[in-house]
Amino acid sequence: MVSLDKTGEGFLVEQDNEATKMWRYGLGLWKLPGVKDTCLAWQLKFGFDVSFLIFLSWVGCVRRESIGRDQVQRANAEVSEWRETVIEPARTARKYAKAENSEAKPELTHVFELLRAVELRSELREQVMLLRWWRSQEKIAGEGQGLVQSVKDYLSIVSHSPDLVEEGELQRICGLIANIELPDDR
């Protein structure tokens, strides 16, 4: 039976300790004030991938490594097929089941929970793919940039427009992310 843990804690990757830590880190980001609402709005408006933001912030804020625009583009290409063929359809199905469930169809509650579990597990898989891809990349000193610029680059890649997000909003979200308290076991 699938674990239906609402937080995603049940989907840890035992064979990859860093991926497990990145997943927990992402759960912590999600709880920061305004991060969830902003990320969901960006997801709806621009096709923004929250797992990709978690990856960018993990690389920049936790690993303290730089990621350049070309690397952002290559990383996005690495997972775009997975995102489009697995994550997005799972998300669409979950949203549909939730909407149907809200119309007094309690038998869909279990279906909704299963679809949410599939979506979370698929997002975890994407994070693992991104982390493994990053580990395989040659790191070039001086090539990278800060988190704000990496997120801007990603937004311009997925939305085909570099200035869709208000600068203040971007700075605020990236500032929250950059200052998250990390667990001592990293």
What are the functions of these language-model segments?
Residues 97-177:
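A charged, amphipathic interaction segment
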Residues 20-22, 46, 159, 174:
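Charged, terminal alpha-helix-loop-beta segments
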Residues 2-4, 8, 26, 33, ...:
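Acidic, glycine/proline-rich low-complexity segments that act as flexible tails and inter-domain linkers
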